[in-house]
């Protein structure tokens, strides 16, 4: 997941934005402040969604379904179970989103200091690119979270239906 389409898409878009920034010669400091403000305004909502989804899967799963999901996916002893894969997708997404939020909050504080430097353009461009990459990556990781919540719901539905069908077949036999 770390080297997924979300990662490469975020990296590609960040490079494209970087090229446009160098060509356009806009006010990098204002652009940095705006980028940080946008990220800080949307990321807590996305982070809350991911934490809520993680809590939903960890806290509200039926024990027999979670037992089935805890079986290793492969034949080797070190293969992860689907439950571990599901949990790791959420954990990585949440960690990256927390790091993105920390980066943007720190950049916000630094922007408010109004420091001047001979390296201001380079520092501002680096901050912009770091903020854009991490925020795009955090947003695109939400796709994997939604996908895993959906798959978890489908597995819960399947296990419940299978249990009902097994009970019906026992009654018939």
Question: What is the meaning of each model-derived region?
Answer:
Residues 36-51, 133-135:
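Alpha-helical transmembrane segments
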Residues 2-42, 117-120:
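Long, highly hydrophobic alpha-helical transmembrane signal-anchor segments
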Residues 125-151:
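Alpha-helical membrane-embedded segments
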Residues 92-115:
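Alpha-helical transmembrane segments and their membrane-interface junctions
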Residues 5-13, 88-100:
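Select subsegments of transmembrane alpha-helices in polytopic membrane proteins
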Residues 53-69:
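Membrane-water interface of transmembrane alpha-helices
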Residues 148-173:
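Cytosolic/matrix-facing juxtamembrane and C-terminal tails of multi-pass cellular membrane proteins
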Residues 70-89:
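Short membrane-interface loop/juxtamembrane segments of multi-pass integral membrane proteins
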